């Protein structure tokens, strides 16, 4: 018998994310996810897709791999409203985002906006005044 932990013990010890262990991976959350509907899961990881996939990815492969997934979630809460285990996925994704930002990760689109404001005085990168 081979037992594969896949980050479960680490997740069990973390009260912020322990709830993710109750995920049945039934896909009910994906059926109502607007991001999944538009992107068909193509960019939502390979551990598992959706917001809960961002949490699992962070524990199995590290926060760096989970970063794009965490910032793709809209935090709309539709997943929570249909989850048979009543997992509060948006709250966990928000906690993951906070941890990523505290570790210095800034999503590329937000970093781009910040640079544009600094260099051009506007978020669009327009060189001339927009009226």
Stretches with model-predicted labels:
Residues 1-3, 131:
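Short hydrophobic beta-strand segments
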Residues 3-25, 53-75:
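Ferredoxin-like iron-sulfur electron-transfer modules
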Residues 7, 27, 41, 45, ...:
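Residue-identity detector for glycine
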Residues 28-55, 72, 78-99:
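Iron-sulfur cluster-binding cysteine motifs and their immediate structural context
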Residues 60-131:
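Iron-sulfur-cluster electron-transfer modules
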């Amino acid at each position: 018998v081979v037992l594969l932990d896949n980050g479960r013990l680490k997740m069990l010890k973390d009260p912020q994310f322990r709830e993710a262990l109750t995920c049945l991976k039934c896909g009910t959350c994906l059926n109502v996810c607007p991001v999944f509907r538009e992107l068909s899961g193509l960019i939502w990881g390979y551990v598992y897709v959706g917001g809960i996939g961002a949490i699992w990815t962070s524990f199995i492969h590290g926060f760096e791999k989970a970063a794009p997934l965490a910032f793709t979630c809209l935090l709309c809460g539709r997943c929570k409203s249909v989850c048979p285990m009543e997992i509060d996925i948006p709250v966990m994704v928000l906690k993951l985002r906070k941890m990523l930002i505290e570790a210095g990760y800034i999503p590329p689109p937000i970093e781009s906006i910040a640079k544009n404001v600094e260099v051009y005085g506007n978020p669009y990168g327009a060189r001339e005044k927009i009226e």
